[in-house]
């Protein structure tokens, strides 16, 4: 086992998705010493871990990028760009089209683009995992990291879990914490649709969540989120039913799956232990329970925590309860915003209400296609 000699970082960040990469960038720019551990490789074409995701950047996430003065390079954008969603209830066969303003993108390249903005002053371990961590008698966090084909020990004054739904930081700090979760299953197919599309599917016989299909760079991404029990069987039935609506889903090129959280009450959000460990993004439970959109909350929670840590002066243990309270207060608006999303759920996921909304045509677009 190797050890970073005589180095105690101000912050150790686990996970460099949108939340972790944003936090690492902001802290390093403001002069804090940062070490980060990420499962992804640094080269977009070298394989390795990729976050399963439909790859649509919602308006809230676009605003988060805009507020931070960031833009999207052409290499991140996917073809085509879509301006409406075809919404299908697989049980009733009712369809509507709604206008939407998502950016179609390559999620993996987006994540790596955010990582590339982290200043070189930060120490970043790519293609690496945290195997364990503890706090020593001086209040310093000790992380056991597997990186560069060996075990390393890393030391930091604060620890931030930005490692998503299956966060090792959250699981170890709060082993009894329970939050509603689902399995998202997604497959990629050769896109044989006659027209590019973004589609959204509902079928309350299989899930109280939703499914999606997105044309992306010559492929069709098709997926859905299910309660974890029998998710594979539910996905196959879901896919079969979608095929009846003209979708070509016979020969998947690859299959992905991941855990996804779905908060339903304030206690589902866990911000940290009050003693120098913090959680941001989906690791903290910050993901929309209606749309499963999490990128905006990831970047926004990271921005809040960056302000708190960088403005703290000395990161001493006696200050940690105060910093935790500041994070709780400043993130309250974010958490309340997430809880208001629950109010949308009956109109999206309760079959009778959804059928009434779709039948009424409220907010639906009239689509005329000339062949």
Predicted regions and their residues:
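Redox-cofactor binding/interface segments in oxidoreductases and associated redox assembly factors
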Residues: 14, 161-162, 279
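FAD/FMN-dependent oxidoreductases across multiple families
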Residues: 132, 229-305
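A short, Lys/Arg-enriched amphipathic alpha-helix followed by its capping loop at the start of a domain
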Residues: 23-32, 64
């Amino acid at each position: 086992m190797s050890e970073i000699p005589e180095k105690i970082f101000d912050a150790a960040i686990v996970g460099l998705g949108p939340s972790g990469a944003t936090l690492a960038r902001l802290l390093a720019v403001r002069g804090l010493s940062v070490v980060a551990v990420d499962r992804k490789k640094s080269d977009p074409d070298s394989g390795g871990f990729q976050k399963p995701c439909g790859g649509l950047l919602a308006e809230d996430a676009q605003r988060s990028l805009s507020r931070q003065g960031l833009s999207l390079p052409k290499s991140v954008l996917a073809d085509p760009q879509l301006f409406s969603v075809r919404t299908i209830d697989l049980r009733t066969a009712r369809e509507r089209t709604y206008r939407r303003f998502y950016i179609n993108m390559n999620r993996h390249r987006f994540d790596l683009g955010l990582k590339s903005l982290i200043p070189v002053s930060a120490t970043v371990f790519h293609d690496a995992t945290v195997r364990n961590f503890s706090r020593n008698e001086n209040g310093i966090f000790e992380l056991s990291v597997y990186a560069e084909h060996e075990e390393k020990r890393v030391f930091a004054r604060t620890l931030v879990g930005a490692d998503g739904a299956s966060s090792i930081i959250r699981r170890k700090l709060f082993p009894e914490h329970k939050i509603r979760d689902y399995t998202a299953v997604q497959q990629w197919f050769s896109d044989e649709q006659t027209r590019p599309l973004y589609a959204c599917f509902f079928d309350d016989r299989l899930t109280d969540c939703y499914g999606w299909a997105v044309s992306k760079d010559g492929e069709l991404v098709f997926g859905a989120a299910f309660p974890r029990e029998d998710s594979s069987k539910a996905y196959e039935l879901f896919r079969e039913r979608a095929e009846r609506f003209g979708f070509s889903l016979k020969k998947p090129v690859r299959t992905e799956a991941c855990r996804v959280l779905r908060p339903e009450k304030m206690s589902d959000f866990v911000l940290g232990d009050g003693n120098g460990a913090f959680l941001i993004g989906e690791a903290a439970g910050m993901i929309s329970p209606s749309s499963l959109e999490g990128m905006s909350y990831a970047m926004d929670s990271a921005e809040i925590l960056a302000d708190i840590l960088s403005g703290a002066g000395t990161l001493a243990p006696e200050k940690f309860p105060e910093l935790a309270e500041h994070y709780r207060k400043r993130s309250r608006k974010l958490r309340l915003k997430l809880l208001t999303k629950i109010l949308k759920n009956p109109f999206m996921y309760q079959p009778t209400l959804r059928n009434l909304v779709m039948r009424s045509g409220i907010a639906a677009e009239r689509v005329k296609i000339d062949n």
